């Protein structure tokens, strides 16, 4: 297995632009293409997954709504949220299927939050990561030609109010939370969190990291 993982820090980006770049990367990659993680924040946007239903958008606003090709229902992205896109060739990994990749992503977040003294957990019937019943991390993937794209969105220090305009991930009344609810502002640091996410994901899947 090629165990190299390229990590790209992309900063603040338009959702649709990055989405189409993920599609292009996945469509043109071959057996020699190294796996990559893209770390990004997005301008405010609601995204509907393939299972998304219009009724889960409760209130229209100036925030755009984009129909995406990832799994899952509607969610919200905005600055202050760490989005980690996972572009990997699942076929390279022995005994790794889509469900196990989802589990690895959830455990990446659980282990990251544990470093801040936060006890979090996944739910078997609702992908993502939760703290005291509130959702702190959303997750949705797309698999094409045995390769993944899309990934996870971990709330760090953002305006959570627009989540009230939707049923997050299709669940009415689901409350959202973020890292800044549990630690001081200095600890809710973008670079610190992203470094921990990368480390734990790489450790779980046996990668060597190259940061670009």
Curated annotation (Swiss-Prot):
GO terms for molecular function: lipoyl(octanoyl) transferase activity. GO terms for cellular component: cytoplasm. The keyword Phosphoprotein does not apply. Its EC number is 2.3.1.181. In the reaction, the free carboxyl group of octanoic acid is attached via an amide linkage to the epsilon-amino group of a specific lysine residue of lipoyl domains of lipoate-dependent enzymes. One of its GO terms (biological process) is protein modification process. SUPFAM superfamilies: Class II aaRS and biotin synthetases. It catalyses: octanoyl-[ACP] + L-lysyl-[protein] = N(6)-octanoyl-L-lysyl-[protein] + holo-[ACP] + H(+). Residues 31-209 form the BPL/LPL catalytic domain. Pathway: Protein modification; protein lipoylation via endogenous pathway; protein N(6)-(lipoyl)lysine from octanoyl-[acyl-carrier-protein]: step 1/2. This is Octanoyltransferase. Catalyzes the transfer of endogenously produced octanoic acid from octanoyl-acyl-carrier-protein onto the lipoyl domains of lipoate-dependent enzymes. Lipoyl-ACP can also act as a substrate although octanoyl-ACP is likely to be the physiological substrate. Coiled coil: none annotated. It is an enzyme of class 2 (transferase). Belongs to the LipB family. Its main location: cytoplasm. The gene is lipB. Gene3D superfamilies: Bira Bifunctional Protein, Domain 2. Keywords: Acyltransferase, Cytoplasm, Transferase. The keyword GTP-binding does not apply. The active site is at 169 (acyl-thioester intermediate). It is found in: Cytoplasm. Transmembrane segments: none annotated. The record marks 135 as: Lowers pKa of active site Cys. PROSITE patterns: BPL_LPL_CATALYTIC, LIPB.
